[in-house]
């Protein structure tokens, strides 16, 4: 299709009046400022969580404990066909369809591993700052299925599971723990069995300190979730205003 000068002159285009454009521009500028502030709040809260975890892991009550004393492999297959979830660095355990728009699982997922709420999942998949894979607690309210390549573990308590989750949120902690256990295979693949994952030590505070940590970190995490929700709302508002400029 070729459009020439006369054709373009006859083309009717709808756009907001100058006053409306100025109003939308002003609102967009205000929302951009708010998004920037909100992003900074979220980054600061994430740094706070990291700082709290590092401080607790160096508490005077800490003792070094084999992970095998805190976790046991679940070994439950997906015979009930629970929905397939992935594991994300930033979002934790996520529903593939809800977050990725589609499922990347096999047609038959009965051989997938089941993770209960509170279980620890180890992905064995390198990503970003985590070259040996990521470790996350399943915070989804129901049982989920995950890749058969993942290790799934039941913790001796949910307080311990939460502590392990936040401990391994640190790229440095994850790398220091895992690099001694892993053998790199062909094409940089990670070779580690589910049991081998449990064969190193982590610092664990006493029960009183652990309970205090869980209460504090849970409160901060709940606040962080609200702040992220607000950021998503602001971003949605911005997208809406942008579309209105071209209605």
PLM feature spans:
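A short glycine-rich beta-alpha junction/loop motif
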Residues: 1-19, 143-149, 183-208
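A short beta-sheet element
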Residues: 2-5, 117-172, 193
